[in-house]
């Protein structure tokens, strides 16, 4: 018989109250749920009178099986109990299901309440649902545009570019997903504009009083506390630091004034002025005569100063960029656009519903909306439905309660017995990781903080962890004590969230020490770019592989709970879990090279697979053969097997024009290659003709048949999965056309959107090898699972914050929808506030995701990361933990860039038995010190001796592993040091060009110009802002790029052009004083530019190009003479003269006037290679005219220099 803890016993037996069970990881919540159901049945409650809601269908199946097993076990004791026998039969038909399945049951039973045809079908294919939604969107677009609706046009213009309307469409589709999880989506939508209503006084508005003011007071209070902590240091009063203290006293008073003006509701512009006055006096320089203690405190004061200035800049940028009048204007304009969005969204929902009704379909969002309508619509029929379920269910048990959304919460409320406490909710807010499904952890937290304070509710905390060893439990607690707090995550982890060790069945001599393995990314030479926003380091995978091999070689022992014995480690005991699956393909490749078995439980990233890239390129080619990259990719693929030398022959014969032109020309050559080209073009033309008269799905299948593609990929490694992937694309094309869509280009665009949204189509292929293989999965997929050894990988990945800087933010709080009005180029106060809130919500969920990952380990936890400049990061982490409180300050947490920013501060602190915690790099030779390894984070005293005895052998093993890894010579090493694609900005670095115009230009503008109107007053903490030479050079290029040669030929014209660039948001107003207007005016008035004035239509600026270049021409010592690199770049300018093209490039390099001739020659040598590259590109782009002259425009020297 199971011995339950006191808290578990309460959760099983307590009744008469609404009960919330907060069940930490590994606390046996499923066992408790099953036992509670059994107790209900044994007390005479039929299982049919219970509603048990689970999060997944698999969980529902498991729940049913476990309940049936419990009843069967009881029947062994009471074989004559007929009631139990009837209950055993009833379990399969009992209401144990997901919320969607329950809602579907409501609809099938009471469809007539909402006038729904009972013969409806469920739209289970997500892709088909997306297609139908897309069709609804296109139809409302057409209705609006045909009606010449200017408000709608303004909305689309605000969020979309010149070429498409994807920005506005994405907004409407995302808003749909949020609105339809609300119990009253129309009310939710109608409330969206209200947060913009501020009248003529910001300070008196609800927005300011209820949202912005409390946030700012809290932030400034935190800054004040940091200042006060420094001023409380005894050493700050020393004679060495008198001026430092004076500086901080003055700053502290200014910060107090800002806080006081906020707190007392002074006018907005006065609050803004007080913020702008928050500055430090002149910097104090450090003296060598100071004591060591003074120097240490001085350095702390400098670090704090930088941090304070940084935080104040962010506050200014978010809430005080312009004065009150301008802020109100932005809010009013935004409000108008939001009202238009609301109207369009309602039409989209109505149109989508209409299309589904016409086909008698309902989708998953309909299930919950329809069920809620049936249960709450104010008609006699609705009351019948609601009363039916209220009478039917004596108790409602909800698993994973932390992941319910607002609509689901209201459905549950609607069926709860009136006036009775019949809710039993189990969950763990620390494991709420489904924000992308509109999960609402705040619903759990609301009950968590109120239940138990009256006689109608009860809160039970299950903290005992029966999964993990004491060391794993201690590691998790140590790491999360500083992270999860009441103001970050909503729970005080130290007081109420810690795991309590409960797995006393583990033997005491098991090897269980937690480990973390860091690689210094800066020193690694092979890296993959992943879709999560960072690089996935080769060495990170290699070190995981090395550690697995080491564990196997050491005959590492695991505890088998089934046999209650120790046994040697098997591969199936190991799980590698990651934040995303984007690196799966690379991990699989490395494991295959290492001959280690690996089973990927998640679907691969479908759109990254070789076969999908190949077929999509062929479809692009059929749609438009005048595309070089798809054309060459298809020709080089296994379908046609054109080799590099053959492609080179084709290009040499026709060096001008695109590659399709060259291919067509070569097809007439009487040779084996010419015949090959001709056959390729014939098949392409056949398929293009076929595409014009047949369905897309038929075209895809025709490609498979003509090229034998299915047979080809089946013969490759993992061939069956590749075949499934291709067949899946065919099925999606069929679904696409069934939904009423047509056109190959549109289908390609649709698939591209799915790729960008990472909506994988393929399903994982089950494998016989899964039984004894290392498991690779995402943290989301690992939830609810456990493994003896867990590697948590990719902890150095940068968080993806792109959505936070977008044109809109959607949330389910009071702000709802917040947008950026593009004509102002500043974020409205509402948008700035929403971004702050959204960032914290996102990072809170990332912290919870991390918690889920770390708590999967039973016996051993290994954390793995590749980190840039690891030593600098370690210094930063040391300063980010408040050691007295064991807390990472909130401001540090909401600025976290990666999981390591959460974990690092605690990992870097001294531990109780620090003498056993060593950098294992100390055992390595200097050349091998790529890896920073720390083991045994939580060693207990009795294990110190054993660990010291083993350390020499472990260090020797690590040394050997690292040497083997880095003595390996990759046969294509040269190719790993570059890519098949290079931008000119990268190549210019090889030519030592100090100005990366093509790349830096857009980055400079986007980061510095957040609004069109110039700020009249510069905040004092921004005064004296310095611009680099590259930034100034970029701005000079920008002026010349847009200069109008059709205007007046004078200095005033130049000033007007610069002012217009500032007004348009293309040039930072703070940059203008740094421009050399004399140099700019010299050039536009020079003899060289005189033809520009005469024929401005012949002048081409910022011309983009792509060119295939020999790699050996770009990179020294490149061993493969046949290797090619596709170069993409932008030419500053060229002029179409009568006899040919005049190519020119601006340079802002400093020219030494004392030795001008030699300095110019040096600059000329530096950039000759670059201009030759531009010359080659222009010659390939132009059939009629070739480059007849190349010139460097040296703005500093006021010289036009010809280049050979």
From Swiss-Prot:
Its cofactor is Mg(2+). InterPro entries: AddA (IPR014152), DNA_helicase_UvrD-like_C (IPR014017), DNA_helicase_UvrD/REP (IPR000212), P-loop_NTPase (IPR027417), PDDEXK-like_dom_sf (IPR011604), Restrct_endonuc-II-like (IPR011335), UvrD-like_ATP-bd (IPR014016). GO terms for biological process: double-strand break repair via homologous recombination. Residues 497-784 form the UvrD-like helicase C-terminal domain. It catalyses: Couples ATP hydrolysis with the unwinding of duplex DNA by translocating in the 3'-5' direction; ATP + H2O = ADP + phosphate + H(+). One of its GO terms (molecular function) is double-stranded DNA binding. Residues 2-469 form the UvrD-like helicase ATP-binding domain. ATP binds at residues 23-30. Its EC number is 3.1.-.-, 5.6.2.4. It holds the Pfam family UvrD-helicase. PROSITE patterns: UVRD_HELICASE_ATP_BIND, UVRD_HELICASE_CTER. Keywords: ATP-binding, DNA damage, DNA repair, DNA-binding, Exonuclease, Helicase, Hydrolase, Isomerase, Nuclease, Nucleotide-binding. One of its GO terms (cellular component) is DNA helicase complex. It comes from the Bacteria. HAMAP family: AddA. Heterodimer of AddA and AddB/RexB. The heterodimer acts as both an ATP-dependent DNA helicase and an ATP-dependent, dual-direction single-stranded exonuclease. Recognizes the chi site generating a DNA molecule suitable for the initiation of homologous recombination. The AddA nuclease domain is required for chi fragment generation; this subunit has the helicase and 3' -> 5' nuclease activities. Belongs to the helicase family. AddA subfamily. This is ATP-dependent helicase/nuclease subunit A. The gene is addA.
